[in-house]
Amino acid sequence: MEKSLIILKPDAVQRGLIGPILTRLEARGLKFIGIKLSQVSSELAHKHYGVHEGKPFFAGLVSYITSGPVLVVAVEGKDVIEIVRSTVGATNPVKAAPGTIRGDFGVNIGRNLIHASDSPENGDHEVALFFSSEELIRSERSVDQWITE
């Protein structure tokens, strides 16, 4: 099963969008295996966004993600990366399709509400950065048989 890390960034938390965003993700049939409110440290932000180090926007990105509480969510399922990313929408909310999280709630690329893993490999890596194995809970849901074949 694929895993994806989803981060509801400080702007989503401050704007009171946790409920509407989680509702959309859950309605897609995603199985939450970990969820917590967290304050991202500078060290963790550097590890998470390390691939962008040296780019002009890196310092601002670290400053933004550490500026307030975030909601960190781990999800698991078949094709979860593709499902989450299509639900989230394009990185730039101006270009995100209506009906996506960023298309409906986003304002600009600098405050784009949400992070989602972009590959199964990154999903595994990112979930491990933010959650210990003890924090991940896997269980069967009665609805699973109606969601996947």
Curated annotation (Swiss-Prot):
Homotetramer. It comes from Herpetosiphon aurantiacus (strain ATCC 23779 / DSM 785 / 114-95). Its main location: cytoplasm. One of its GO terms (cellular component) is cytoplasm. Its EC number is 2.7.4.6. This is Nucleoside diphosphate kinase. SMART domains: NDK (SM00562). The active site is at H115 (pros-phosphohistidine intermediate). ATP binds at K9, F57, R85, T91, R102, N112. The keyword Transferase applies. Keywords: ATP-binding, Cytoplasm, Kinase, Magnesium, Metal-binding, Nucleotide metabolism, Nucleotide-binding, Phosphoprotein, Transferase. It comes from the Bacteria. It is found in: Cytoplasm.
